[in-house]
Amino acid sequence: MTISFIIPIFNSELYLKKCVESIFNSSLSEIDIEVFLVDDSSTDDSVKVAKELSQQYNSIEVIEQNNQSNRGASVARNLGLKEATGDYIWFMDSDDYLDSTLVGQIIGDIKKYNCPDIFAIQLKLIDGKITRIECSQPNVKHNIVLKGRDAILSGYQPSSVCAIICKREFLDNNKLRFYEGISHEDVEFSMRAVALAHSVYFSDYLAYIYTMHAGSVSKSRTAERQYFYIIGDMYVALSLQKFVKTIDDVELQNHILRWSNNILLNLSLSVKRSNNPLMDKNFKKKVFLDMKNHGVFPLKGPFTSWKIWLLSKLVNLSCIHL
Protein backbone atom coordinates (compact mmCIF):
# COMPACT_ATOMS: atom_id res chain seq x y z
CA MET A 1 0.00 0.00 0.00
CA THR A 2 1.36 3.40 -0.97
CA ILE A 3 0.58 6.70 0.71
CA SER A 4 0.68 10.08 -1.02
CA PHE A 5 1.40 12.95 1.37
CA ILE A 6 0.29 16.31 -0.06
CA ILE A 7 1.82 19.30 1.71
CA PRO A 8 1.24 22.91 0.61
CA ILE A 9 4.19 25.10 1.58
CA PHE A 10 4.09 28.82 2.18
CA ASN A 11 6.82 30.59 4.14
CA SER A 12 7.51 27.56 6.30
CA GLU A 13 11.29 27.28 6.00
CA LEU A 14 11.63 26.90 9.77
CA TYR A 15 9.23 23.98 10.09
CA LEU A 16 9.25 22.06 6.80
CA LYS A 17 12.14 19.74 7.59
CA LYS A 18 10.55 18.56 10.84
CA CYS A 19 7.26 18.00 9.00
CA VAL A 20 8.83 15.90 6.26
CA GLU A 21 11.16 13.95 8.51
CA SER A 22 8.23 12.91 10.71
CA ILE A 23 7.00 10.96 7.67
CA PHE A 24 10.31 9.30 6.82
CA ASN A 25 11.09 8.53 10.47
CA SER A 26 8.04 6.27 10.58
CA SER A 27 8.17 2.52 9.98
CA LEU A 28 6.95 2.95 6.39
CA SER A 29 9.36 1.99 3.65
CA GLU A 30 10.35 4.86 1.36
CA ILE A 31 9.06 2.87 -1.64
CA ASP A 32 5.58 3.02 -0.06
CA ILE A 33 5.68 6.82 0.26
CA GLU A 34 5.39 9.72 -2.14
CA VAL A 35 5.50 13.28 -0.87
CA PHE A 36 4.37 16.30 -2.85
CA LEU A 37 5.66 19.63 -1.57
CA VAL A 38 3.57 22.23 -3.39
CA ASP A 39 4.94 25.74 -3.10
CA ASP A 40 2.46 28.61 -3.01
CA SER A 41 4.73 31.55 -3.88
CA SER A 42 6.77 31.50 -0.69
CA THR A 43 8.90 34.58 -0.11
CA ASP A 44 11.36 32.88 2.25
CA ASP A 45 13.66 29.89 1.66
CA SER A 46 10.90 27.26 1.80
CA VAL A 47 11.54 26.11 -1.78
CA LYS A 48 15.27 25.84 -1.12
CA VAL A 49 14.58 23.65 1.93
CA ALA A 50 12.09 21.58 -0.07
CA LYS A 51 14.61 20.96 -2.85
CA GLU A 52 17.29 19.99 -0.34
CA LEU A 53 14.87 17.47 1.16
CA SER A 54 14.08 16.11 -2.31
CA GLN A 55 17.81 15.44 -2.77
CA GLN A 56 17.82 13.52 0.49
CA TYR A 57 14.65 11.52 -0.20
CA ASN A 58 13.95 10.24 -3.73
CA SER A 59 10.21 9.98 -3.12
CA ILE A 60 9.77 13.76 -2.69
CA GLU A 61 8.56 15.87 -5.60
CA VAL A 62 8.64 19.66 -5.37
CA ILE A 63 5.90 21.44 -7.32
CA GLU A 64 6.38 25.14 -8.00
CA GLN A 65 3.52 27.31 -9.23
CA ASN A 66 4.19 29.87 -11.91
CA ASN A 67 2.38 32.73 -10.27
CA GLN A 68 3.35 35.79 -8.28
CA SER A 69 0.73 35.71 -5.53
CA ASN A 70 -0.34 33.29 -2.84
CA ARG A 71 -3.30 31.24 -4.14
CA GLY A 72 -4.08 29.29 -0.99
CA ALA A 73 -3.88 25.73 0.28
CA SER A 74 -6.86 24.58 -1.82
CA VAL A 75 -5.07 25.24 -5.10
CA ALA A 76 -1.90 23.59 -3.82
CA ARG A 77 -3.76 20.51 -2.61
CA ASN A 78 -5.63 20.17 -5.90
CA LEU A 79 -2.32 20.34 -7.77
CA GLY A 80 -0.97 17.60 -5.52
CA LEU A 81 -4.04 15.46 -6.16
CA LYS A 82 -3.41 15.69 -9.91
CA GLU A 83 0.01 14.13 -9.44
CA ALA A 84 -0.69 11.63 -6.66
CA THR A 85 -0.59 7.92 -7.45
CA GLY A 86 -0.78 6.42 -3.96
CA ASP A 87 -3.55 4.19 -2.68
CA TYR A 88 -4.33 6.74 0.05
CA ILE A 89 -4.00 10.50 0.33
CA TRP A 90 -2.79 12.07 3.57
CA PHE A 91 -2.97 15.87 3.69
CA MET A 92 -0.61 17.79 5.94
CA ASP A 93 0.27 21.41 6.64
CA SER A 94 3.94 22.27 6.34
CA ASP A 95 4.34 23.59 9.89
CA ASP A 96 2.83 20.48 11.48
CA TYR A 97 4.23 16.98 11.99
CA LEU A 98 3.25 13.39 12.70
CA ASP A 99 3.84 11.13 15.66
CA SER A 100 6.13 8.85 13.65
CA THR A 101 5.61 5.92 16.02
CA LEU A 102 1.92 5.70 15.10
CA VAL A 103 2.06 5.97 11.30
CA GLY A 104 2.79 2.29 10.70
CA GLN A 105 0.02 1.25 13.10
CA ILE A 106 -2.46 3.47 11.24
CA ILE A 107 -1.57 1.93 7.88
CA GLY A 108 -1.88 -1.51 9.47
CA ASP A 109 -5.38 -0.69 10.69
CA ILE A 110 -6.40 0.66 7.29
CA LYS A 111 -5.54 -2.77 5.86
CA LYS A 112 -7.13 -4.57 8.80
CA TYR A 113 -10.47 -2.84 8.29
CA ASN A 114 -10.63 -3.59 4.55
CA CYS A 115 -9.36 -0.26 3.30
CA PRO A 116 -12.26 2.10 4.10
CA ASP A 117 -12.88 5.15 1.93
CA ILE A 118 -11.86 7.36 4.86
CA PHE A 119 -9.76 6.61 7.93
CA ALA A 120 -9.98 9.37 10.54
CA ILE A 121 -7.43 10.27 13.19
CA GLN A 122 -7.27 12.91 15.92
CA LEU A 123 -5.15 16.05 16.18
CA LYS A 124 -3.14 17.46 19.04
CA LEU A 125 -3.19 21.26 18.92
CA ILE A 126 -0.23 23.04 20.49
CA ASP A 127 -0.63 26.79 20.95
CA GLY A 128 2.13 28.06 23.19
CA LYS A 129 1.61 26.42 26.57
CA ILE A 130 -1.90 25.27 25.66
CA THR A 131 -2.41 21.73 24.38
CA ARG A 132 -5.76 20.23 23.46
CA ILE A 133 -7.20 17.41 21.38
CA GLU A 134 -9.19 18.27 18.27
CA CYS A 135 -11.19 16.27 15.72
CA SER A 136 -12.05 13.66 18.37
CA GLN A 137 -15.65 13.38 17.05
CA PRO A 138 -17.18 12.35 20.42
CA ASN A 139 -20.66 11.83 18.96
CA VAL A 140 -19.51 9.29 16.37
CA LYS A 141 -18.84 5.60 17.06
CA HIS A 142 -15.14 4.81 17.05
CA ASN A 143 -13.17 1.71 16.10
CA ILE A 144 -15.90 0.36 13.85
CA VAL A 145 -16.55 0.80 10.14
CA LEU A 146 -19.56 3.05 9.46
CA LYS A 147 -21.32 4.46 6.46
CA GLY A 148 -20.46 8.10 5.98
CA ARG A 149 -24.09 9.18 6.13
CA ASP A 150 -24.51 7.43 9.50
CA ALA A 151 -21.47 9.26 10.87
CA ILE A 152 -22.94 12.60 9.80
CA LEU A 153 -26.40 11.83 11.17
CA SER A 154 -24.88 10.81 14.51
CA GLY A 155 -23.11 14.16 14.84
CA TYR A 156 -19.92 14.23 12.76
CA GLN A 157 -18.43 17.74 12.76
CA PRO A 158 -16.17 18.41 9.75
CA SER A 159 -12.91 20.10 10.59
CA SER A 160 -9.30 19.87 9.47
CA VAL A 161 -8.71 17.78 6.37
CA CYS A 162 -5.49 16.63 8.02
CA ALA A 163 -7.65 14.40 10.22
CA ILE A 164 -8.99 12.28 7.34
CA ILE A 165 -6.85 9.88 5.31
CA CYS A 166 -8.74 9.28 2.06
CA LYS A 167 -8.62 6.50 -0.49
CA ARG A 168 -7.46 8.08 -3.75
CA GLU A 169 -9.80 5.98 -5.88
CA PHE A 170 -12.73 7.20 -3.78
CA LEU A 171 -11.72 10.84 -4.25
CA ASP A 172 -11.24 10.41 -7.99
CA ASN A 173 -14.45 8.46 -8.56
CA ASN A 174 -16.46 11.17 -6.81
CA LYS A 175 -14.47 14.04 -8.36
CA LEU A 176 -13.73 15.33 -4.88
CA ARG A 177 -11.50 18.36 -5.01
CA PHE A 178 -11.08 21.46 -2.86
CA TYR A 179 -13.17 24.61 -3.33
CA GLU A 180 -10.55 27.14 -4.38
CA GLY A 181 -10.43 30.75 -3.27
CA ILE A 182 -12.25 30.49 0.06
CA SER A 183 -11.34 30.05 3.72
CA HIS A 184 -12.55 27.04 5.74
CA GLU A 185 -12.22 24.86 2.65
CA ASP A 186 -11.33 21.94 4.94
CA VAL A 187 -14.82 22.00 6.44
CA GLU A 188 -16.53 22.09 3.05
CA PHE A 189 -14.36 19.29 1.63
CA SER A 190 -14.60 17.05 4.70
CA MET A 191 -18.40 17.22 4.86
CA ARG A 192 -18.80 16.29 1.19
CA ALA A 193 -16.22 13.51 1.46
CA VAL A 194 -17.77 11.87 4.52
CA ALA A 195 -21.28 12.22 3.06
CA LEU A 196 -20.22 10.33 -0.08
CA ALA A 197 -18.16 7.68 1.68
CA HIS A 198 -19.50 4.13 1.77
CA SER A 199 -17.11 3.27 4.59
CA VAL A 200 -15.47 5.44 7.24
CA TYR A 201 -13.46 4.47 10.30
CA PHE A 202 -12.91 6.83 13.23
CA SER A 203 -9.84 5.85 15.21
CA ASP A 204 -8.42 6.99 18.54
CA TYR A 205 -4.97 7.63 17.11
CA LEU A 206 -3.62 11.00 18.26
CA ALA A 207 -1.11 11.03 15.45
CA TYR A 208 -1.06 14.55 14.01
CA ILE A 209 0.55 17.46 15.83
CA TYR A 210 -0.96 20.80 14.81
CA THR A 211 1.09 23.78 15.87
CA MET A 212 0.21 27.46 16.03
CA HIS A 213 3.01 29.85 15.17
CA ALA A 214 3.28 33.64 15.14
CA GLY A 215 3.04 33.64 11.34
CA SER A 216 -0.02 31.42 11.14
CA VAL A 217 -2.75 32.70 8.80
CA SER A 218 -5.25 33.13 11.63
CA LYS A 219 -2.79 35.29 13.60
CA SER A 220 -1.64 37.69 10.89
CA ARG A 221 -4.73 39.48 9.66
CA THR A 222 -5.44 42.75 7.92
CA ALA A 223 -9.04 43.92 7.56
CA GLU A 224 -9.06 42.47 4.05
CA ARG A 225 -7.72 39.16 5.28
CA GLN A 226 -10.20 39.15 8.15
CA TYR A 227 -13.07 39.65 5.71
CA PHE A 228 -11.83 36.80 3.52
CA TYR A 229 -11.65 34.56 6.59
CA ILE A 230 -15.12 35.52 7.88
CA ILE A 231 -17.01 35.39 4.58
CA GLY A 232 -15.59 31.95 3.85
CA ASP A 233 -18.31 30.51 6.09
CA MET A 234 -20.94 31.85 3.71
CA TYR A 235 -19.32 30.14 0.74
CA VAL A 236 -19.03 26.88 2.67
CA ALA A 237 -22.76 27.00 3.47
CA LEU A 238 -23.70 27.89 -0.12
CA SER A 239 -21.57 25.08 -1.51
CA LEU A 240 -23.06 22.49 0.84
CA GLN A 241 -26.59 23.66 0.03
CA LYS A 242 -25.79 23.13 -3.64
CA PHE A 243 -24.19 19.76 -2.86
CA VAL A 244 -27.23 18.32 -1.07
CA LYS A 245 -29.26 18.69 -4.26
CA THR A 246 -27.03 16.07 -5.86
CA ILE A 247 -27.68 13.30 -3.31
CA ASP A 248 -30.78 11.11 -3.06
CA ASP A 249 -30.81 10.55 0.71
CA VAL A 250 -33.54 12.89 2.02
CA GLU A 251 -32.59 12.47 5.68
CA LEU A 252 -28.98 13.28 4.92
CA GLN A 253 -30.01 16.21 2.72
CA ASN A 254 -32.07 17.75 5.51
CA HIS A 255 -29.33 17.25 8.09
CA ILE A 256 -26.65 18.94 5.99
CA LEU A 257 -29.04 21.73 5.00
CA ARG A 258 -29.83 22.48 8.65
CA TRP A 259 -26.17 22.27 9.56
CA SER A 260 -25.22 24.72 6.79
CA ASN A 261 -27.89 27.15 7.96
CA ASN A 262 -26.40 26.94 11.44
CA ILE A 263 -23.09 28.04 9.89
CA LEU A 264 -24.81 31.14 8.51
CA LEU A 265 -26.36 31.90 11.89
CA ASN A 266 -23.01 31.53 13.66
CA LEU A 267 -21.42 33.76 11.05
CA SER A 268 -24.05 36.44 11.64
CA LEU A 269 -23.69 36.24 15.41
CA SER A 270 -19.89 36.39 15.33
CA VAL A 271 -19.96 39.49 13.14
CA LYS A 272 -22.70 41.22 15.13
CA ARG A 273 -21.06 40.61 18.50
CA SER A 274 -17.46 41.21 17.48
CA ASN A 275 -15.41 43.90 19.20
CA ASN A 276 -12.47 43.28 16.89
CA PRO A 277 -11.21 46.72 15.76
CA LEU A 278 -10.80 45.34 12.24
CA MET A 279 -14.54 44.62 12.15
CA ASP A 280 -16.01 48.12 12.36
CA LYS A 281 -19.53 49.14 11.34
CA ASN A 282 -18.65 49.37 7.65
CA PHE A 283 -17.04 45.93 7.80
CA LYS A 284 -20.21 44.48 9.33
CA LYS A 285 -22.42 46.20 6.77
CA LYS A 286 -20.33 44.71 4.01
CA VAL A 287 -20.72 41.19 5.41
CA PHE A 288 -24.51 41.38 5.67
CA LEU A 289 -24.81 43.02 2.26
CA ASP A 290 -22.73 40.22 0.77
CA MET A 291 -24.95 37.64 2.47
CA LYS A 292 -28.07 39.43 1.24
CA ASN A 293 -26.76 39.53 -2.33
CA HIS A 294 -26.19 35.77 -2.17
CA GLY A 295 -29.71 35.16 -0.89
CA VAL A 296 -28.80 33.94 2.59
CA PHE A 297 -29.77 37.01 4.65
CA PRO A 298 -32.17 37.52 6.29
CA LEU A 299 -31.63 34.02 7.70
CA LYS A 300 -34.33 31.59 6.65
CA GLY A 301 -33.64 28.12 8.02
CA PRO A 302 -34.47 25.30 8.52
CA PHE A 303 -32.23 24.94 11.56
CA THR A 304 -31.30 22.10 13.87
CA SER A 305 -33.72 23.14 16.64
CA TRP A 306 -36.58 25.53 17.35
CA LYS A 307 -34.36 27.44 19.78
CA ILE A 308 -31.87 28.14 17.01
CA TRP A 309 -34.76 29.08 14.70
CA LEU A 310 -35.94 31.61 17.30
CA LEU A 311 -32.43 32.97 17.69
CA SER A 312 -32.22 33.45 13.92
CA LYS A 313 -35.33 35.64 14.01
CA LEU A 314 -33.76 37.82 16.70
CA VAL A 315 -30.57 38.10 14.67
CA ASN A 316 -32.55 39.13 11.60
CA LEU A 317 -34.31 41.88 13.55
CA SER A 318 -31.15 43.21 15.15
CA CYS A 319 -28.94 43.10 12.06
CA ILE A 320 -31.24 44.06 9.21
CA HIS A 321 -30.58 47.78 9.67
CA LEU A 322 -26.81 47.55 9.99
Describe every region a protein language model picked out.
Residues 12-26:
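Short, well-formed alpha-helical segments that are part of the catalytic scaffolds
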Residues 2-4, 22, 34, 188:
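Cell-envelope/extracellular polymer assembly enzymes that use nucleotide-activated donors
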Residues 66-84:
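Glycine-rich, basic loop-to-helix element that forms the pyrophosphate-binding segment
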